[in-house]
From Swiss-Prot:
Record protein name field: Large ribosomal subunit protein bL27
GO biological-process terms attached to the record: translation
Family in the record: Belongs to the bacterial ribosomal protein bL27 family.
Gene: rpmA
Keyword Cytoplasm in annotation: no
Length: 95
């Protein structure tokens, strides 16, 4: 009597997909007109999409942070650049 044995599990190839990098949580962290404390992060970014303005520092990874306690203001810098500043008093819009 001959006994024929078969594999009881099918051989499975591995997929070359199925991995992704963790998100970096970039973007604007404080809104226009919001009160911030010195050291608060205003924007996390790669490159200077938004430039540092008055009372705003820039970290080595281009993170913008408040240098003083005050109110956040997003402004235009020329025609095509944006900047964020922090002022001790709330800025009133001039019409």
């Amino acid at each position: 009597m001959k006994l024929q044995l078969f594999a009881h599990k099918k051989g499975v190839g591995s997929s070359r997909n199925g991995r992704d990098s963790e998100s970096k949580r970039l973007g604007v962290k404080r809104a226009d007109g919001q009160f911030v404390l010195a050291g608060n992060i205003l924007v996390r970014q790669r490159g200077t999409k938004i430039h540092p303005g008055v009372n705003v520092g820039k970290g080595k990874d281009d993170t913008l942070f408040a240098l003083i306690d005050g109110y956040v203001t997003f402004e235009r810098k020329g025609r095509d650049k944006k900047q964020v500043s922090v002022y001790p008093e709330r800025k009133v819009a001039q019409n």
